[in-house]
Amino acid sequence: MPRYTVHVRGEWLAVPCQDAQLTVGWLGREAVRRYIKNKPDNGGFASVDDARFLVRRCKGLGLLDNEDPLDVALEDNEFVEVVIEGDAMSPDFIPSQPEGVYLYSKYREPEKYIALDGDSLTTEDLVSLGKGHYKIKLTPTAEKRVQKSREVIDRIVEEKTVVYGITTGFGKFARTVIPVSKLEELQFNLVRSHSSGVGKPLSPERCRMLLALRINVLAKGYSGISLGTLKQVIEVFNASCLPYVPEKGTVGASGDLAPLSHLALGLIGEGKMWSPKSGWADAKYVLAAHGLKPIVLKPKEGLALINGTQMITSLGCEAVERASAIARQADIVAALTLEVLKGTTKAFDTDIHAVRPHRGQVEVAFRFRSLLDSDHHPSEIAESHRFCDRVQDAYTLRCCPQVHGVVNDTIAFVKNIITTEINSATDNPMVFASRGETISGGNFHGEYPAKALDYLAIGVHELASISERRIERLCNPSLSELPAFLVAEGGLNSGFMIAHCTAAALVSENKALCHPSSVDSLSTSAATEDHVSMGGWAARKALRVIEHVEQVLAIELLAACQGIEFLRPLKTTTPLEKVYDLVRSVVRPWIKDRFMAPDIEAAHRLLVEQKVWEVAAPYIEKYRMEHIPESRPVSPTAFSLEFLHKKSTKIPESEDL
């Protein structure tokens, strides 16, 4: 029998339908009838017939025709909103689609699983879980650890031992002993009272990461959660039922209490929840629509769900993966700019970097060689200026290995810390089953990921800083020898004039965002928690910095490709031509001014989805595998003694006569 969940004036009603041929209008009237039945004053209606209403889908808020049959208009268990004529939309009714921050494709229910053991999760895995590519299951070893850990908690409760967070209050109330009869109530109160965050909800991708990471930490077996409860949490994740988690409210010690409490609040069937099937609705109805029941917390389980650094580190995983992606692609974009500006490749000579062998610097120089080696990848643009009188390029071109290189090394350093953190137990107290006891400690303190993510923001920002200067060189005719702002009929057309201003604005904003949040601390919880990390803000602003970097490089990518138009019919190297073709598949050349924002967004999408890297990477790896000797063209810019000797001894043509 089909059943629908209907929202009427703040009330959620389950309405079964015995005949699928009944109409949307019938569903609305039946929902209103049930609403009136539950109200002492009939909800202000004399009868159901007096009600005038519209029916909308909760997901997308699409308006439905009252005459359409239910089996045509709706799916079983779908969520709908009945809007009474004269009423505004219910003030507590949240828009059905949370604000997106990722430019990824729409959710499709995954078929593959990732087995979590609490020890081997990678940042790549967590981001894939966030995108909805996988479901979760536990390894047998993890299940055994969780069971043994829970046995310790059960024994503490049975023996009425006084242990923090299990039989006592929290924070300032740590010395308040709670009666056994109220231990479960204690856990529910903890979750409800700590759900006090503010701001926009996390996107589905980020909420999935947060939930998946909490599952991974619980799978380590040091938190005392029962196996049954943990499996319920996994079922919620696999159904993509995602609680409403405000992005603001954590100080990063004791863990990320507010956001994780909101996460747990949805699991117990309270607050709001979102799923691809339902949109936003009350958590208990979203769970019911997926055949799930709210979790009933046992002693210690509320604390087990909310104490840890998972908000910081889940966002940190996204930050480090996006930083890695844009850092790789920044080399490709800069190489294309160098070609357009007719720069020299000699600054990327292996001997230069062998005497200063930072790993990132060496790798960036190699990537430039693999893309620009004109012997391996003939470039008509490079040939056109092989014997020019330019001695060396500006720092923004010549020093890319040194500037981009340290960004790569920064990312590697941060990734190591984040990888350790996502596989760490950050609860308190910790349950050590092998010792049969609990120990209070400070693993919940977010200083490690907070400091690392502040460092990440500072490092990655430099990619935008140097990119903006390259955009200036592309747009400035005195530096590029190209039309001003990369457009014909300058004056009538403004070209990239304001796109460059946008890049400058983003770089300036990043300079403020790069101020470390982890240098701040405020005493909280009546001075019990008297030093905190502010890691939540470190993670959120790192992501903002990275997004700005992506957008600046998107503008540079567009500008470099537009510069190519003024060098035609000359061709660049094969890999860079492939990059040009990729960009032109989504953004056409500028013949005259047009609405530019969609083009910047399209280029940004290419970078976020790593399409630029996918096009160039095969050429880079082929170059690496073949160990191709680098090109050292005979050119004045290389200071070749052999060339200078030939030049000084060559007989001028006029003397041949």
UniProtKB/Swiss-Prot annotation:
Example of a GO biological process term: L-histidine catabolic process
What are the coiled-coil residue ranges? none
InterPro entries registered for this protein in UniProt: Aromatic_Lyase, Fumarase/histidase_N, HutH, L-Aspartase-like, Phe/His_NH3-lyase_AS
- Give the Enzyme Commission number: 4.3.1.3
Q: State the post-translational modifications.
A: Contains an active site 4-methylidene-imidazol-5-one (MIO), which is formed autocatalytically by cyclization and dehydration of residues Ala-Ser-Gly.
Q: What PANTHER family does the record point to? A: HISTIDINE AMMONIA-LYASE
Protein's name according to its UniProt entry: Histidine ammonia-lyase
Query: Cross-link (5-imidazolinone (Ala-Gly)) at which positions?
Result: 253-255
Keyword terms, alphabetized: Histidine metabolism, Lyase, Phosphoprotein
